[in-house]
Amino acid sequence: FSDVDTKLIVVPSFKDIAMNKSPISTTHVRKNDEHIDFKDIRLYLQTFRKQNINFLEILFTKFYICNTMYCDEWNRLIAAREQIAHYNEKRAVQTMYGMSLEKYKQLEKDTPSHKEELAKYGYSAKELHHLLRLEEFIYRYTRGTSYEECRQTKAADYLTAVKLGYFNLNFAREAARSSIERIEKMANDFCQKDIEPHKEVEDLLNDVQYNIMKKAIT
């Protein structure tokens, strides 16, 4: 039912560093439209700092392959995944709000990936699904729910119906409009709080990066 998108984290060689090669960051789209994101470990750890859901999720998956050379360091990240996912809560909410706005703008936008849905429903059911799912995630995250729990929807049947395009265009427009309004209010209210990034997480990310890079070139 869902695409299987993959993240592939790469470690630069000594030659890459010595020759000042840019860190790898690219996406490969497979024939079945599934995506593989290739990203240098240095850049990937930066995505943790930016609190992007799409990149934080790998800390919570049960399906991964790890080079044994780096497993000890990776397991440190897994052990601290909740702390990492709450490293900078304001930025996390701002990032989720930004993603929500993008989904809202994409609802009726004519793009190659939307053509089939627009012809069928007049809107992208997939984008509406993402928007409503983000609203639920933000609601629970801003109320102190663990990241692991936030990832598990409490409205599976409804969201499945949305994703399958069971609702007409007028419903979709109203659902999207009211959702983005609620998200904006939640984000604004939360970001007024006095919350600082967690220094211990910053120290952990720096230490893991240092150790991985050291192992890679020695």
Residue ranges and their predicted role:
Residues 1-28:
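Catalytic metal-binding acidic patch
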Residues 2, 9-11, 35-72, 79-92:
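Internal, well-ordered alpha/beta segment that forms a basic, Gly-enriched binding/recognition surface
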Residues 10, 48, 135-142, 216:
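Generic structural signal for hydrophobic core residues of well-folded globular domains
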Residues 20-32, 48, 53:
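Conserved His + Asp/Glu catalytic blocks
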Residues 29-30, 41, 60-62, 111-114:
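Short acidic (Asp/Glu) patches
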Residues 68-207:
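Conserved nucleotidyltransferase catalytic core and NTase-mimicking acidic/glycine-rich helix/loop elements
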Residues 203-218:
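A cross-kingdom marker for long, charged
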